[in-house]
Amino acid sequence: MSAAFKELYNTKIVPKLVSDFNYDSVMQVPKLEKIVVNMGVGEAVSNSKLLDQAVEELTLLTGQKPVITKAKKSISNFKLREGQSIGAKVTLRGDRMYYFLEKLVSVALPRVRDFRGVSANAFDGRGNYTLGVKEQIIFPEINIDKVNKVRGMDIIIVTTAQTDAEAKSLLTEFGFPFKK
C-alpha cells in the first residue's frame, strides 16, 4: 500500500497552505481526520442477502470490515422496525484513508459517466465534505459481472479545517476535481 498522498501532504501541501493562509504554526494547517464510507441498503428490510453483498463490496473497496448500521426508529410506511439492519459503514483513518482518497481521486471519479467535476457546494460549514456516488462499479475492485444491483454510497471527508475555504483548498491540493 502506497502512502503517496501522505507524502504529498507533508512535502507539498503543508508549505503551500501555510503560505496561502498565513498560519503561525505548521500545526494549524488543516489535515484529513477520517473518511467515512456509508452504504444505505433500504431493501435489506425484505432481503437480508443484499446487506451481506453490500458488506462484501465495502470490504473490497476499503480493505476494512464495515460496521452494520441499524434503524433508529420504526417507520411503518417503509415496513421498518427499530434495530433492523439497514446499511453498512466504514471509518477510514491513517494510511488506509490516504490510500482510499488516492484511489477515489485518481481512478474512481474519472470513471464516472459524464463526469465534469464534483460540486463545490457540498461543504457543511465546518470544513467537512460530503460526496454522493451513484454506482459502486466506478471502483476497480468491484467486478461488474458479480454485481447483482447497482448501489450508491456516501463518502464523507472529515478535516480539521475551521472554514470551508480552508477545506476546499486542502482537497484541491490533493487533486479533487471541483467544478469550475
UniProtKB/Swiss-Prot annotation:
InterPro entries in alphabetical order: Ribosomal_uL5 (IPR002132), Ribosomal_uL5_bac-type (IPR020930), Ribosomal_uL5_C (IPR031309), Ribosomal_uL5_CS (IPR020929), Ribosomal_uL5_dom_sf (IPR022803), Ribosomal_uL5_N (IPR031310)
Signal sequence region: none
Disulfide bonds: none
GO CC aspect terms: ribonucleoprotein complex; ribosome
Keyword tRNA-binding tagged: yes
KW tRNA-binding (keyword) present: yes
Example GO biological process: translation
UniProt-listed PROSITE patterns: RIBOSOMAL_L5
Record keywords: Ribonucleoprotein, Ribosomal protein, RNA-binding, rRNA-binding, tRNA-binding
Subunit structure of this chain's protein: Part of the 50S ribosomal subunit; part of the 5S rRNA/L5/L18/L25 subcomplex. Contacts the 5S rRNA and the P site tRNA. Forms a bridge to the 30S subunit in the 70S ribosome.
UniProt function note: This is one of the proteins that bind and probably mediate the attachment of the 5S RNA into the large ribosomal subunit, where it forms part of the central protuberance. In the 70S ribosome it contacts protein S13 of the 30S subunit (bridge B1b), connecting the 2 subunits; this bridge is implicated in subunit movement. Contacts the P site tRNA; the 5S rRNA and some of its associated proteins might help stabilize positioning of ribosome-bound tRNAs.
PANTHER family attached to this UniProt entry: 60S RIBOSOMAL PROTEIN L11-RELATED
HAMAP family given in the database record: Ribosomal_uL5_B (MF_01333_B)
Annotated family: Belongs to the universal ribosomal protein uL5 family.
Name of the protein: Large ribosomal subunit protein uL5
Natural source organism: Acholeplasma laidlawii (strain PG-8A)
Taxonomic lineage from the root: Bacteria, Bacillati, Mycoplasmatota, Mollicutes, Acholeplasmatales
Gene: rplE
